[in-house]
């Protein structure tokens, strides 16, 4: 008898559970069906996301609006579906840096054809599978102030007004932008649900950006992502980049996890607006140099080197480093209290000096002896904005041809073979296109910083080999201001190739009126952890710049100007004229 009662009780529980599930599904679906049936325009509803590439365009907001809809209020907030498409919100610590996410990259979108008001919508034009324009030309663009401090005394403002910093990229097509989101795919509106999401309206409401201000209301990390194209990580005068730098230094941190892999401790921080950044804590003071007996592969990763690398990359006009900003972090409130990573949480302790410390898990320097301690719980670090998740925008990792041996005694092939470049130039992708010139740009960039740790680089898989290379992981730069590591310049010495635009900008930055050290000091002074670089590091930049220019002159004397300097400015001029 007792067993029969137990079985009946279990059946009753199961029935109640199934009824609750059915009721939940009905409550969730009925308001949406009712809203679609009563839509004033008579159109069937669509909870699909707007193509992200169109969202980036100036004319997208107007094309998306409907008669009778207001441009302001809650409707102007970004579509949560689009946010879900463009960044993975997984709690996986390796999110954005691995392929763990199961979300699939949407296929290319059809251009939306909107009929004039009062007319029937036209049938969509036939698709040209080979090549079609992404955005309509919005007409003359207003003059946008250059990034950085403005004013009559700003060296940066004057630099960015120079003709060398005014060249245009070719007109963009669907194949040239990173994101072409298929608007026909239906996404779960609960995927990016967050009770703290600002500007939310009634439960179940659709969030379709409308009106002129819609794109301006997108989070700055999203503007950064949808602005990536074949030619640049971000455009020269994109105001979202400086806004993103401010976000990195001020946005509320909602969760923290350790980044898997890597030799030293790094944390993945997620913000209230769903943006994510990689946090590298301070390990050395500004004036400390790398000990002379340290190998390059056991050197500390410096947070201020990551910050300075972004600013140097932008001054050189490469624009291949994701935005990085400094920030003071409260280790108790902004790391320990918000992390769900038990392995990280367990490493917190109070030092004999009553400071909060932690050490995490990693290959090097993750122990009680190398703990990171606050004062008493404040710690300085860098926050690098994440690139789009690998499940959405795959990246290809390439072994640097001039990679070091990472061995205490062995040397790499390029260190013993003076003709090594000839072998490289016969190997894809260096045998065609501009990849070898990209390597030369990266060489100059690394030499100016003193970075010997460039073992790999990455590109966006969508763009194939005809695209820029991304300058990631610059934490081992700016380690020695009293020593110039000439071996970093081996690719330039062996290949004797450089872009004309790069060469001219280096010459410009060597002039007194555009002195590189002064430009860097001005660019870095607005960071929250300024001064970012020790003065002797700034002076080393000018000294190393002269060494690079002398290396190019030596190549020109040996091989001739036309063989050494690749004229890429003629191509830029043609693109500017066409546009």
Swiss-Prot record:
Q: Name one GO biological process term.
A: positive regulation of bone mineralization
Tell me its EC number(s), please. 2.7.11.1
Q: What happens when the gene is disrupted?
A: Mice survive to adulthood and show biomineralization defects, suc as severe amelogenesis imperfecta (AI). In addition, mice are severely hypophosphatemic and develop notable lesions in both dentin and bone.
Highest taxon in the source lineage: Eukaryota
Q: Keyword Transferase, does the record have it? A: yes
Q: Is the Repressor keyword given for this protein?
A: no
- Activity regulation (UniProt): Serine/threonine protein kinase activity is increased upon interaction with FAM20A.
| Stretches with biased composition (Basic and acidic residues) | 111-120, 128-140
Which residues constitute the catalytic centre? 453
Which residues does Mn(2+) bind? 301, 473
Kinase domain: where is this region?
Answer: 349-560
User: Changing residue 374 to E/R: what effect?
Assistant: Abrogates kinase activity
Q: In which tissues is it expressed?
A: In the mammary gland, expressed at higher levels in lactating mice than in virgin mice (at protein level). Highly expressed in the tooth. No expression in the dental pulp. At the secretory stage of amelogenesis, it is detected in the matrix of the enamel, in the ameloblasts, and within the cells adjoining the stratum intermedium (a tissue layer analogous to the stellate reticulum seen in the developing molar). Strong expression is observed in maturation stage ameloblasts and throughout the non-cornified layers of the gingival epithelium.
Disulfide-linked positions: 357-373, 362-366, 421-495, 496-555
Ranges of the Lumenal topological domain: 32-579
Residues that hold ATP according to the record: 264, 280, 301, 384-387, 458, 473
Could you tell me where the Low complexity compositional bias lies? 49-63
> Which residues are on the Cytoplasmic side of the membrane?
1-10
GO cellular component assignments: cytoplasm; endoplasmic reticulum; extracellular space; Golgi apparatus; Golgi membrane; nucleoplasm
Chain ranges passing through the membrane: 11-31
Q: What family does the entry list?
A: Belongs to the FAM20 family.
* Role according to the record: Golgi serine/threonine protein kinase that phosphorylates secretory pathway proteins within Ser-x-Glu/pSer motifs and plays a key role in biomineralization of bones and teeth. Constitutes the main protein kinase for extracellular proteins, generating the majority of the extracellular phosphoproteome. Mainly phosphorylates proteins within the Ser-x-Glu/pSer motif, but also displays a broader substrate specificity. Phosphorylates ERO1A, enhancing its activity which is required to maintain endoplasmic reticulum redox homeostasis and for oxidative protein folding.
Output this protein's name.
Answer: Extracellular serine/threonine protein kinase FAM20C
What species is this protein from? Mus musculus
């Amino acid at each position: 008898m007792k067993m029969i009662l137990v079985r009946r009780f279990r059946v009753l529980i199961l029935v109640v559970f199934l009824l609750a599930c059915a009721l939940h599904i009905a409550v969730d679906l009925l308001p949406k069906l009712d809203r679609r049936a009563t839509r004033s325009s008579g159109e069937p509803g669509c909870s699909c996301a707007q193509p992200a590439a169109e969202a980036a365009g100036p004319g997208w907001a107007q094309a998306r609006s409907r008669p009778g809809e207001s441009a302001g209020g809650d409707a102007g907030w970004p579509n949560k579906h689009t946010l879900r498409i463009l960044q993975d919100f997984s709690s996986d610590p390796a999110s954005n840096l691995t392929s763990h996410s199961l979300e699939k990259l949407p296929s290319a979108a059809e251009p939306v054809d909107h009929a004039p008001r009062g007319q029937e919508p036209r049938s969509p034009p036939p698709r040209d599978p080979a090549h079609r324009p992404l955005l309509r030309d919005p007409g003359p663009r207003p003059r946008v102030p250059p990034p950085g401090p403005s004013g009559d005394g700003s060296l940066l403002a004057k630099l960015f007004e120079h003709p060398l910093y005014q060249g245009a990229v070719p007109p963009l097509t669907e194949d040239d932008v990173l994101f072409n989101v298929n608007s026909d795919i239906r996404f779960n509106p609960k995927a990016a649900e967050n009770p703290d999401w600002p500007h939310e309206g009634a439960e179940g409401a659709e969030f379709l950006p409308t009106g002129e201000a819609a794109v301006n209301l997108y989070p700055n990390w999203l503007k950064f992502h949808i602005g990536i194209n074949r030619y640049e990580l971000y455009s020269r005068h994109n105001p979202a980049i400086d806004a993103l730098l401010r976000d990195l230094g001020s946005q509320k941190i909602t969760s923290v996890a350790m980044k898997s892999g890597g030799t030293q401790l790094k944390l993945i921080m997620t913000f209230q607006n769903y943006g994510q950044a990689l946090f590298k804590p301070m390990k050395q003071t500004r004036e400390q140099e790398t000990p002379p007996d340290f190998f390059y592969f056991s050197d500390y990763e410096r947070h201020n080197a990551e910050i300075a690398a972004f600013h140097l990359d932008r001054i050189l006009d490469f624009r291949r480093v994701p935005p990085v900003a400094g920030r003071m972090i409260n280790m108790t409130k902004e790391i320990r209290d918000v992390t769900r990573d038990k392995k990280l949480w367990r490493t917190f302790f109070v030092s004999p000096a009553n400071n909060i410390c932690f050490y995490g898990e990693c290959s090097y320097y993750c122990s009680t002896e190398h703990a990171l301690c606050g004062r008493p719980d404040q710690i300085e670090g860098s926050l690098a904005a994440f690139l789009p998740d690998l499940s959405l925008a795959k990246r290809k990792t390439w072994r640097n041809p001039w990679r070091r041996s990472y061995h205490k005694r062995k040397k790499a092939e390029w260190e013993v073979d003076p003709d090594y470049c000839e072998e490289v130039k016969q190997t894809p992708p260096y045998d065609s296109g501009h990849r070898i010139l990209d390597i030369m740009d990266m060489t100059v960039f690394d030499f100016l910083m003193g970075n010997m740790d460039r073992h790999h680089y990455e590109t966006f898989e969508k763009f194939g080999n005809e695209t820029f290379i991304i300058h990631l992981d610059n934490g081992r730069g700016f380690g020695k201001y009293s020593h110039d590591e000439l071996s970093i310049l081996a690719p330039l010495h062996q290949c004797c190739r450089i872009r004309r635009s790069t060469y001219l900008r280096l010459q410009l930055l060597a002039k007194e009126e555009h002195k590189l050290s002064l430009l860097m000091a001005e660019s870095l002074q607005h960071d929250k952890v300024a001064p970012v670089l020790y003065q002797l590091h700034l002076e080393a930049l000018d000294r190393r710049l002269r060494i690079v220019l002398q290396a190019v002159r030596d190549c020109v004397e040996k091989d001739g100007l036309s063989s050494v300097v690749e004229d890429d400015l003629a191509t830029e001029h043609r693109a500017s004229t066409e546009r």
